[in-house]
Amino acid sequence: MAAATTYLRTLLVLGRVSNVPTVWSNCFAGWLLAGGGDGGRFLLMAFAATCLYVGGMYLNDAFDASFDLQHRPERPIPSGAIRVEAVWAWGFGWLGLGLACLFGFGQSAIICALLLVVAILVYDAIHKIFALSPLVMAVCRFFLILLAASAGRDGITGLVIWTALALGGYIVGLSFLARKESTLAPASHWPCLFLAVPLMLALIVNQGGYLLRAVVLCTLVGIWMLRCLNFALWSTQRNVGRCVSGLLAGIVLVDLLAAWDGSPLTGSTFAALFGLALLFQRFVPAT
């Protein structure tokens, strides 16, 4: 029983499941911006996206096995908790399951899913050797939003694309900060500019009677960002990992900012996903 529990935790750590609520949040936002639609179709698409995310995370560790052996020996593969061959199999298995779930969603969904998988594999393969790999990570989240929108009633619209680009900006800033997590070098301030992209888009697209709500939400999201950034930039006890974990959970707030229509149900759904992301981080590391 203990061995099974240990192996299950290993699988959860490999899949970085504490970030799965942010995948669900991306899916919910993309689907809402595309006009919503059939709930069953949305749930299947969200499950497929979860499979693609988890598969990508498994393969991330598989690609990094040699690096982790020297620099992160506590990770599941170098610590001996699981064999690298098993991680490769799990990773491609999750990717295959995710793609299989999307075969009935139409051409645009299949194209977005395939492009997402390509971006995932490219990121996993080069992120340790390519200085601009955060851009590739942003591309992954970009196509995730488009994939979710392709399951909606209106499909991929201009607003969906702009929202996906704004989320990509946030991911770029977050990812560049995350690169400082395992180093002693001070974190740079310039990624904060990218974190602000969703705030700027929200203020641009929400005019008239929607502006006040946008300002309030931007203020709340901005406060959370500053709280997280304090751990990396200004605190006397520097903790980049805590900053990055908080910003990862903050992806849900970015989605709320983009897609909330004022509905209590929609708002409470995003709030629940934000709470889940923070809760999951107590048990499984987010990075």
Predicted regions and their residues:
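N-terminal, positively charged, Ser/Thr/Ala/Gly-biased leader segments
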Residues: M1-F28
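Multi-pass membrane catalytic core of lipid/isoprenoid biosynthesis enzymes
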Residues: F47-A48, A65-I120, L135-A138, F142-L146, ...
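Divalent metal-coordination and catalytic microenvironments
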Residues: G15, D64, L256
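Membrane-embedded alpha-helical segments that form the functional core of polytopic membrane enzymes
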Residues: W24-F63, L95-F103, A109-Y123, I161-G173, ...
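Acidic (Asp/Glu-rich) catalytic motifs at the cytosolic membrane interface
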Residues: A49-A86, L174-A187, F280, V284-P285
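C-terminal membrane-associated helical module and adjoining short loops/tails
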Residues: A2-L12, F142, A148-T287
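Short, amphipathic, aromatic/basic-enriched membrane-interface segments that mark the entry/exit
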Residues: T10-S18, D61, I77-V87, G104-A109, ...
